[in-house]
């Protein structure tokens, strides 16, 4: 852990945004594994033009990682916007996800784009997101940040591995956007156990990024 603190303090350059593999046509319930995508809220709050729909940027909340989504994946690519006979979530369903996702609008969008491909009902999909988050321990180090730091993807990966011994570097992808940490994406089996990401998903940010401190 001492080495982790030293690495977080290193002044380095900013990183470019990460590109992603392509989406594919899909059928609900037909996929190979999940990606749990965790967004670093301070980066989003810094870059978003309008944050009124999210409480993650409220001053004094010191929000760190929030859930972006739980995404069905193929071993190559991923499905999205799958046809489904499942009804859409109610407003109450999406409001109940605000504590994890920061906004009901994001919960709705994630259901529409990714949840429909899970083959689950909306309420069960949201329950699955909650279950997935209980499987991952957020490193305490990041919640204690009191200043912006510059670091590389392996430092973040090592912190998650130290807090979650079942994880490996091949099971974590760290992305950046606009020179800031964007997301940590963790690959899970369909029953939410850690696994390696497929090769096309292992695309870490290759340069140094800034990790803005929670406010």
Describe each model-derived feature in a short phrase.
Residues 1-4:
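Positively charged n-region of N-terminal signal peptides that target proteins for export
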Residues 7-17:
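Bacterial N-terminal signal peptides
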Residues 19-21:
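C-terminal region of N-terminal signal peptides and the immediate post-cleavage residues
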């Amino acid at each position: 852990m001492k080495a982790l603190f030293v690495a977080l303090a290193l002044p380095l350059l900013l990183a470019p945004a990460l590109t992603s593999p392509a989406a594919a046509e899909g059928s609900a319930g037909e996929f190979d594994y999940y990606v749990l995508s965790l967004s670093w809220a301070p980066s989003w709050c810094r870059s978003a033009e309008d944050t009124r729909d999210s409480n993650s940027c409220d001053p004094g909340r010191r929000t760190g990682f929030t859930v972006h989504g739980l995404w069905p994946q193929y071993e190559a690519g991923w499905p999205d916007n799958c046809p489904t006979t499942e009804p859409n979530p109610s407003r109450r369903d999406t409001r109940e996800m605000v504590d994890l996702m920061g906004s009901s609008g994001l919960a709705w969008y994630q259901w529409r784009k990714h949840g429909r491909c899970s083959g689950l009902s909306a309420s069960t999909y949201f329950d699955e997101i909650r279950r997935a988050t209980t499987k991952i321990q957020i490193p305490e180090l990041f919640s204690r940040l009191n200043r912006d730091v510059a670091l590389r993807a392996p430092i973040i990966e090592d912190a998650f591995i130290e807090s979650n011994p079942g994880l490996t570097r091949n099971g974590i992808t760290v992305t950046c956007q606009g020179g800031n940490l964007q997301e940590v994406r963790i690959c899970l089996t369909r029953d939410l156990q850690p696994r390696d990401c497929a090769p096309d998903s292992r695309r870490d940010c290759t340069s140094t990024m800034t990790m803005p401190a929670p406010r």
